[in-house]
Amino acid sequence: MNKLFLILLLIFSHEVFSQTSAEVLQSKLNAIQTMTANFSQIVKAKNHEVSRSSGSMALQRPGRFRWQTKDPLEQLIVADGQKMWIYDVDLEQVTVKNQEKGLGGTAALFLSGYDETLTHDFDVSEKQKGKLTVFDLKSKSAKENFQRIKLIFSQSALIGLELYDQLGQITDVKLVQIKSNPKLPAKLFQFKPPKGVDVVKQ
């Protein structure tokens, strides 16, 4: 869940690609300044399902994000461009991080303005799969948290992601009820800890 939030924030925070397939991908991402959707997510390891979750998300470029998991456990992640709050409802705990610290690695560089980082760290290719366009990002370094990322588009809409991490886990995300470039209220990307919860600063 956190992994997906971080990678989406990473994707929608940079600006410039230099390779042909990357240029096409960047054009699609640049066209999405705001977005809302419902998601379903399955995490697998060695062909076995590890977890399943669902909820809703909203984003506003650059760097603002809301990721709310409703099932099976309620969790809310909010990023406002500077800070990131992770609210675990069942634990009655909020973790607060500087956004770049929370992202770490490549994402932090993107947010800091190192626009060429993605082409330094990933090889980007694309292919058609029926009516879908799949962009395949492969890490150039074994140290990256995500060794491979697939972004799946139906025309201009991002409808799915597949994330492959260092441990061999695959996170498969489907997005539905997608709205591109709606006007979003600022309060979506603001967070005030509820009374009585523990607040942990990192």
Swiss-Prot record:
Subunit organization: Monomer.
Any one Gene Ontology cellular component term annotated for this protein: outer membrane-bounded periplasmic space
InterPro entries: LolA/LolB/LppX, OM_lipoprot_carrier_LolA-like, OM_lipoprot_carrier_LolA_Pbac
Major localization class: periplasm
Protein species of origin: Legionella pneumophila (strain Paris)
Swiss-Prot/TrEMBL keywords: Chaperone, Periplasm, Protein transport, Signal, Transport
Protein name as it appears in the record: Outer-membrane lipoprotein carrier protein
Record keyword Signal present: yes
Biological processes per GO annotation: lipoprotein localization to outer membrane; lipoprotein transport
Keyword Ribosomal protein recorded: no
Residues making up the signal peptide according to the UniProt record: 1-18
Pfam families per record: LolA
TM regions (residue ranges): none
Function: Participates in the translocation of lipoproteins from the inner membrane to the outer membrane. Only forms a complex with a lipoprotein if the residue after the N-terminal Cys is not an aspartate (The Asp acts as a targeting signal to indicate that the lipoprotein should stay in the inner membrane).
Subcellular location: Periplasm
Protein family membership: Belongs to the LolA family.
PANTHER family reported in the protein's UniProt record: OUTER-MEMBRANE LIPOPROTEIN CARRIER PROTEIN
